[in-house]
């Protein structure tokens, strides 16, 4: 690599790292990644716009003899990942932080060779597309981490400097500790709807909403989806029709059959498209607990895609759908509950407990263990819905 090119890499790395020095908040993965054993390379994948680049720069800032580089930089297009890493190692760098590694076609082969040579440690990020997770030949060399979209807690801390700490699901299940948590976070409990509307990403989605989010959706479809399957204009049109239909409907209303009828494609095509849309981070699928006679999932969006699509269509998102989707995006679920007839319900299994999601008038007609209600009430088996946004 020419000296002037690498000099530019150094200058850009220093400027980028300096740009995050003032950021006091960190994504939830930061401390875990700091403790990672250097015996392995580290990969972080996740949806666009949720803080992967800032996370990588913060790690570089706190690591000695480190260099940051964006793999999609145009001036580096003639150099492979191996070329860049080899030059960094030759100049005494011990840690290389590579952003957007999925934009390089031969990145897995380069990482394999670099790991086996053992001259430099690498941490890298990529989109949520499946090609970032595919590297089977890297399984002995790389520890992969998914960076989830920011939780309500992280949204409040990053945007409003709330200083909110994580809570455990077991603390919410205990009435005494739940009371203390609810009182402590009372002023933040009404923010879940703002978070639902535009808080699942960290770029400034609130300004000119929903345009920034719709632009992100377009890029995810045309770039990320194209990296996991072949697409053409017809498939892109089918994807948009599916997304619009899902956005306007409740998760309990959607099925593979009615989506196939609406779009005009086979059920198999719908199933494959839905799975691919989950891989690239647009959808979140929640399957029935213990299967049942049909294992068809509930179809949720990652936040804030449903609200953006609906607002672009001049529609309001149903509040019941918003509550469920907020819950599904913030809680590690074991699955949703079906009735004996196979009807989808707003009940979810979380750590062995049944939790029913609803509004202030929700009654315990399903005999759930707990009610996640859109209120501040924490008495008995009621848990304020917003508190489920503080789990990570």
Give, region by region, the residue ranges found by the protein language model.
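Hydrophobic anchor at the beta1->P-loop junction of P-loop NTPases
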Residues: 44
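Accessory nucleic acid-recognition modules appended to NTPase machines
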Residues: 201-340
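Pre-Walker A adenine-sensing motif
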Residues: 17-36
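Conserved lysine of the Walker
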Residues: 52
């Amino acid at each position: 690599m020419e000296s002037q090119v690498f000099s530019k890499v150094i200058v850009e790395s220093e400027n980028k790292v300096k740009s995050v020095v003032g950021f006091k908040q960190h994504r939830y993965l930061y401390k875990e990644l700091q403790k990672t054993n250097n015996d392995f390379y580290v990969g972080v994948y996740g949806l666009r716009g949720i803080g992967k680049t800032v996370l990588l720069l913060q790690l570089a800032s706190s690591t000695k003899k480190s260099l940051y580089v964006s793999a999609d930089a145009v001036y580096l297009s003639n150099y492979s990942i191996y070329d860049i890493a080899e030059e960094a190692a030759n100049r005494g760098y011990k840690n290389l932080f590579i952003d957007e590694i999925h934009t390089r076609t031969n990145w897995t082969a380069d990482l394999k060779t670099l790991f086996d040579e053992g001259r430099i440690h690498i941490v890298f990020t990529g989109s949520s597309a499946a090609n970032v997770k595919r590297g089977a030949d890297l399984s002995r060399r790389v520890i992969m981490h998914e960076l989830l979209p920011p939780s309500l807690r992280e949204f409040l801390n990053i945007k409003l400097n709330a200083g909110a700490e994580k809570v455990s699901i077991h603390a919410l299940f205990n009435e005494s500790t739940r009371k203390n948590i609810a009182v402590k976070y009372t002023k933040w409990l009404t923010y879940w709807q703002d978070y639902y509307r535009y808080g699942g990403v960290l770029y400034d989605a609130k300004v000119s909403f929903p345009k920034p989010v719709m632009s992100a959706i377009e890029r995810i479809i045309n770039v990320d989806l194209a990296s996991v399957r072949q697409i053409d204009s017809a498939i892109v049109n089918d994807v948009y029709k599916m997304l619009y239909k899902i956005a306007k409907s409740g998760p309990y209303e959607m099925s593979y059959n009615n989506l196939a009828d609406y779009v005009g494609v086979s059920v198999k095509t719908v199933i494959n498209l839905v799975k691919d849309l989950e891989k690239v981070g647009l959808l979140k699928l929640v399957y029935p607990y213990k299967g049942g006679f049909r294992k068809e999932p509930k179809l949720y969006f990652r936040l804030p895609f449903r609200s953006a699509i609906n607002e672009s269509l001049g529609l309001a998102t149903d509040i019941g759908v918003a509550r469920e989707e907020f819950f599904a995006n913030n809680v590690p679920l074991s699955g949703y509950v079906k009735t004996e007839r196979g009807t989808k319900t707003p009940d979810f299994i979380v750590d062995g407990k049944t939790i029913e999601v609803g509004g202030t008038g929700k009654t315990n007609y399903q005999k759930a263990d707990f009610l996640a209600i859109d209120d501040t009430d924490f008495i008995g088996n009621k848990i304020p819905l917003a508190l489920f946004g503080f789990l990570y």
